[in-house]
Amino acid sequence: MHPLDYIINSLGCNIIELDENSLEKKYIKDFLINTGANSYSIKNIFKITESRNDIFFNPYNFDKRYIFFHGTKPENILGILSEGLKISPVQAKFSGKRFGDGIYLSDSYEISIVYSKKDKDKKDKKYILLVEAALGEKNKDYITHDCEIEKEHTFITEEGYRILKIPCNSKRNGIIVVKNAMNVRVKYIIEV
């Protein structure tokens, strides 16, 4: 067995490169551009399916599920894919805890890309995750940007989760802190 195949098999998920002409990739690119990614070149988008972590997702059956960004370093991606996102993992470098321990997500590409460092081997590449978060009631003390999401501003995927279609030039800067790791799962890896 090739070593790369061994690593991919050990992750416990499938990684599928989205076709350049797929509608799914178009919606994701539009979402990225409308949330601040227009200064970055989107090189590739990978969809994560059949993750062994999916069986633990959303144990409280929250009906509000949204897509958010999560910036991370390239060296963290394999661990995230195999074990899921963690609340303040021991091996992670400290990058701020403005709202305490939790998984920090954002509705803004511009905020999340700051936490994504360049690949050491390929100096021009960064990675950002699109994650699905199952949310219960919001804690108003922690909300920096709150608005009602109208139905016409969302795209429902085949899997039933919502992708926000943010109007052009809309400024988003919300930080969402999820306190339970089982309420978050990785759906896409974006290479920029």
Language model features: what each stretch is:
Residues 68-75, 89-121, 131:
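Extended catalytic/binding region for NAD+/ADP-ribose chemistry, centered on the ART fold
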Residues 47-51, 81-90:
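Eukaryotic beta-rich interaction modules
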Residues 1, 78, 87-91, 116-192:
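Active-site and NAD+-binding cores of ADP-ribose-processing enzymes
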Residues 38-39, 59-63, 95-99, 105, ...:
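Intrinsically disordered, low-complexity regulatory regions enriched in Ser/Pro/Gly/Thr
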Residues 52-58, 79-81, 139-143:
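Short, solvent-exposed polar/charged micro-motifs at secondary-structure junctions
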Residues 1-76, 176-192:
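Intrinsically disordered, low-complexity terminal and linker regions
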Residues 6, 30, 47, 71, ...:
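Ordered, helix-dominated protein-protein interaction surfaces in large eukaryotic regulatory proteins
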